Amino acid sequence: MNKLILIIDNYDSFTHNLYQMAGEIMMEMDSADIMVVRNDEVDIDYVRGLDPERIIISPGPGNPIKREDFGICSEVIGEFTDRPILGVCLGHQGIFHYFGGVVGYGEPVHGKISEVFHDGSELFRGVPNPFRATRYHSLRCECSGVPEDILVSASAPDGTIMAIRHRQYPVYGLQFHPESAGTPHGRDILENFLRM
């Protein structure tokens, strides 16, 4: 396995912020390279050849159910469950959907800061409970459709699922944006993921 952090870009402007934050953390850890690829510019064989140590699936517009919006991300989730994967916003919804969850439309929230209550699991180590996080989404993971293999790790007061993790695999999702300045503990959460 390569010491590579692979970020799959779902054509979102926040991807650059994720890349920058992850790069700063990795420099402090004196470890790993980071590479960004667009979700439709590579195939699964290319990703296999990279043999990444960890994968981040970025936010993006659209719906994770549609291949034209989510590209190779579903294939990557299925292929690399043996190593840490973090999905952010669209990536989070895509992970939830891949494992059998229901993703539906909710009231759009764009730039809204919410309190997030978490379960203290490894992704939230050292993070206050609750903490404040920035949300940009019109889709959400439905509470009535949580798959058996998925645990809800965090939620907002309005009931929106804000974080998930797989029961067996090191696969995680965040509905909120850890890379946003409006998520003061987002860097801590991303660092927890990168240190797993």
Swiss-Prot record:
Boundaries of every Glutamine amidotransferase type-1 domain copy: 4-196
Key words of the record: Amino-acid biosynthesis, Aromatic amino acid biosynthesis, Glutamine amidotransferase, Lyase, Tryptophan biosynthesis
InterPro entries cross-referenced by the UniProt entry: Anth_synth/Amidotransfase (IPR050472), Class_I_gatase-like (IPR029062), GATASE (IPR017926), TrpG/PapA_dom (IPR006221)
Enzyme class: lyase
GO biological process assignments: L-tryptophan biosynthetic process
Pathway field: Amino-acid biosynthesis; L-tryptophan biosynthesis; L-tryptophan from chorismate: step 1/5
Reaction(s) this enzyme catalyzes, per UniProt: chorismate + L-glutamine = anthranilate + pyruvate + L-glutamate + H(+)
Stored Gene3D superfamilies: 3.40.50.880
Residue numbers annotated as active site: 89 (nucleophile), 177 (for gatase activity), 179 (for gatase activity)
CDD domains named among the record's database cross-references: GATase1_Anthranilate_Synthase
GO molecular function: anthranilate synthase activity
Assigned GO CC terms: cytosol
EC number: 4.1.3.27
Amino-acid biosynthesis among keywords: yes
Top-level taxon of origin: Archaea
Role noted for this protein: Part of a heterotetrameric complex that catalyzes the two-step biosynthesis of anthranilate, an intermediate in the biosynthesis of L-tryptophan. In the first step, the glutamine-binding beta subunit (TrpG) of anthranilate synthase (AS) provides the glutamine amidotransferase activity which generates ammonia as a substrate that, along with chorismate, is used in the second step, catalyzed by the large alpha subunit of AS (TrpE) to produce anthranilate. In the absence of TrpG, TrpE can synthesize anthranilate directly from chorismate and high concentrations of ammonia.
Subunit structure: Heterotetramer consisting of two non-identical subunits: a beta subunit (TrpG) and a large alpha subunit (TrpE).
NCBIfam families the record matches: trpG_papA
Name of protein: Anthranilate synthase component 2
Annotated source species: Methanothermobacter marburgensis (strain ATCC BAA-927 / DSM 2133 / JCM 14651 / NBRC 100331 / OCM 82 / Marburg) (Methanobacterium thermoautotrophicum)
Source organism phylogeny: Archaea, Methanobacteriati, Methanobacteriota, Methanomada group, Methanobacteria
Gene that this sequence comes from: trpG
